[in-house]
Amino acid sequence: MLRNYILITFRNIVKNKIFILINVLGMGIAVACCIVAYLNWEFSSNFDKHHVHAKNIYRIQSYQDYQGQRNRHALAPIPLGSVIKQNFTDVDRVVRYTASQSNFRIGDEVFGAPMAYADSAFFELFSFTLKSGTFVALHDKSQILIADELARKYFNSEDVIGRQISQINNGVLKEFIVGGVFAVQPLNSSFAFDAIALWDNQWDVTEDKTSGDSDWKNMSTLFIQVKDELRVAGITKQLQAYIEPQNNTREDFKLSEYYLQNFETLAANFYGETWLAGEQLRWGFPPSAIVGPGIMAIFLLLLACFNFTNTSIAISGKRLKEIGIRKTMGGVRGQLIFQFLSESMILCFMALIVGALLAEFLVPAYNNLWPGIKLTLKYSENISFFVFLILLLVLTAFIAGIYPAFYITSFKPVSILKGKLKFGGTNWFTRTLLTFQFAISLLCIISGVAYIRNAGYQRDYNLGYARNGIIVATVANVGEFNAYRNALMMNKNINIIAGSKDHVSDKYYKQPVKFEATEHQVEIVDVGDDYLKAMDIKLIDGRDFKKDSETDKRESVLVSEAFVKQFGITDDPLGKRLLWKDSVQLYIVGVVSNILTDGFWKAAAPVMLRYVGPQQYTQIVVSTSPENLLEVNDYMKETWKKISPNTLYSGKYTDGNMYAAQMINTNAVRIFGFLGVIAALMSATGLFALVSLNILQKLKEIGVRKVLGASAANIVRVINAEFMVILLVASVLGGLLGYFMTDKMMDAIWEYYLPVNFMTLGICIGLLFVIAIITVGYKTIATAWMNPVNSLREQ
């Protein structure tokens, strides 16, 4: 019996090869997208799962309650680690950890790499693969462990035990001996360092080399291991006794509560109700990056299943006699249903093979979209993935084949064999499915066009400071700043050179400021001479800082419009007195336009600019014209090598800080563009199949109409009338869905974006109609001009 089912299936494939090919290709594309979505989910869900002790590791985090908002912080006071070691008997291990970018020198080559400092028990707590050497090297202050990729890149070998590597701190070299080489961590790991040394080494680069571990002002990431989960509540309660020592040393930063966050959930909990400040680990994926691809894949799979169902019902008219005879010969309905579901399973299996082949191309393309993702296709090594494919096959075959199987086998053999029953083409169900197909296609097209327009909008949006033609580099001290500035002044393409301690786009700090009875957290940027001119920050009231003015350094500030608004200053803000750190009196001497320190992500925050002298400069800001940007950057890089040969050039474009927003826009355009094209093609092919089969059902009617004098235009209207109605309904449904869903997506990502407007909707709906007209145009026109004699003779 099974053999007969297979033979019948392949006979029907040959008879309807064009329509079957359309279905298999469409479903294959949908299956490939489902594979990518599953791998994306699996990659995220396995974040940090390779660490053996992950379930027993906790990070000490804290809450800060301020003005009704509970802020989260990932760091804990460094002395708390020693306190826990000495007094908390329920804690099995304690590890302090901190990480930052560092400069290194191997031979004559200077390079930058992420560097970590940790207590000696770090590798006892976390699972790393050792390639050579020993993890015990972390107990030795003179040794360093490096990643295998770093060893291969700069030593051209992994056999580097005993080799020397120099860390550069403020131009001073600190020598290390390589004591171990570890395999670089996967991208779904919290740790992203390429080198790690014993915790005590970090104090060698500070001015005060003795009090670092005992000063409650100093913060770091703090891990503890608790093997018995029942002890966690008691440990959390014990920790609250050490809130006071920290708060006594930080009047500007008072914590409310310590809490423990399980290591396995760190990545998932990064995106909570409030921003997790002070994160030193690799961020996890936002929920939208996990759920989004899955929803898109489901949309495409539904489109493919709709196509399959529509086509199956449409071509079923050719198989009525087969069904009638089989029922007359004793065939029961259950056998026929099983046969149709078997045919669906075989076609879906073919689509699964096509999807697996397409996934070989889609997975690398998806990896290229996101720098923090590396999906891999491993069928034999990943049992859960293999199970997913089987479940996907069964589910797809069931969804696509269940309705046609029950519908086609429901008719009585007498009606079929007497020729009283004829169906095919479209019915209410196929019309509904086609409507949803085009609605989903329109949704994807609207999203793609909206993100394209938004990319241009955000590219030109005024952030309150210059984004183009600005290069910012780090300097160690005033001597280095002066030497570098003097050398750069020789370049005629450089317009302005300014000094600063902070920078509006990526380096500032938050502290409470009080005006009369109102207190708010504000973003404070310490700037130097000519900073406003270099960054093109608009002064809308008052004056700029006076050069070398000790009074301005001590008590003058510039504030943003958002600052004035949030503090409720309704009259002239100039001269108003502010209170900072509970005792420092500051006076507003100028108001600048809003500065979007967080780019498009958040609403303009209240910003306060303070004036600092050259002794505090850590940044040099260079302004040039956009067309000279590359040439000036090259000049700065070469000049830096002469000024500070032991330090890596750190220059970066200010516009580069908008990279994340640009990447999201670009990738959203690519993803929704791909989905829109695929969805439109699926809908178009489904429409083509239904129109073709509908024409076959109406050949006699069309022939009679032409004999009776109907024009070609009238015939085209008869053929396409119901499909135009379907498109109109789909346009309304898809337009509404596209408008609201796209706006919700953008609103969840950005504060400043270009909403979907009527022009976008009009363009997309027009594009959908053009696709539909092109799809059915040739077929309907050819039918309208055919000789009626031929169709009537055949009928």
Label every PLM stretch briefly.
Residues I29-Y58, V363-P371, I440-N468, M745-W750:
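Alpha-helical transmembrane segments
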Residues D119-S132, I144-F285, N486-A661:
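Mid-to-C-terminal secondary-structure elements
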